[in-house]
Amino acid sequence: MAIQRVVSKQAKTQVLLQSEELRGYVPETIIYTRQTLRSMLDQHGMLYIKPDSGTFGNGVIKVEQLSNKLGYRFQSGTKIRTYKSFDSLFTGLEQVRPKRRYLVQKGIQLLKHHKRRFDLRVMVQQNLSGQWESTGIIGRLSHPSKIVTNYHSGGTITPFETLMSSHMNADAQAKYLEKLRRIGVKTAIQLSVRYPNLKEIGLDVAVDTDLKPWILEVNTMPDPYIFRRLSDKGIFQRMRRYAAAYSPKRVVK
């Protein structure tokens, strides 16, 4: 049986919101329109708009209301544009935004490592017993001049411990990793109720300045190869064994 893939970010978000335990980790995410953009900016001040379907951080745009409400700006790729009014901001966004379904998501103030933003990828797979297991957690450090952390968009793969060492001690890191593993498994269980043929997921998790984790989105075709960069080679080897068991056609070298 083929592994189930779910393209729509919003569809997956709606499933997570049905869980009382998980909804507190999901930032507000709604369909992008002129009206929702304005109301979300008024409420949160900083947002990300992104395609409902897509990978590698392509098409993600950061939108902000400037301090004292003196204007707006957005960043797409490495380009930053500033506007004096909401109308001109929206016009500018429509000129650069691909004409397909977009979402608007509450912006999270990410933790930084050497002045660069980072987030985490939590890999979750069905193990050899058919149970969900968090098999790896790795950090992704953003390119200095970009807003996304994806490796394919210039991000740097970095161990969790390296990124978090200046924010918490070793004992706190161990507890935090366990918390992320639990969130990963809970997310997989919740999604598999609606999508029973899922076998693997990758959670993109932001950590805010209060150290709260946020599930930015869930990828149902996660890239395991980034974990080959970890010094503990057993992590990737376990991922490969699990993938071979639930999908012999899923070649993970």
Name these PLM-found stretches:
Residues M1-G59:
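A conserved helix-loop-beta module that forms one wall/lid of the active-site cleft
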Residues M1-Q10, Q14-V15, M168-D171, K175-E178, ...:
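C-terminal active-site "lid" helix and adjoining low-complexity regulatory extension at the edge
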Residues V26-E28, L47-S88:
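Glycine-rich phosphate-binding loop of ATP-grasp-fold ATP-dependent ligases
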Residues H44, G77-G155:
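Phosphate-binding site of ATP-dependent enzymes
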Residues L47, E133, W214-L216:
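Protein kinase-like catalytic core scaffold
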Residues L66, M123-N127, A206-D210:
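Short beta-strand micro-motifs enriched in acidic
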Residues V96-I108, P144-A206:
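A long amphipathic alpha-helix within ATP-dependent nucleotide-binding catalytic cores
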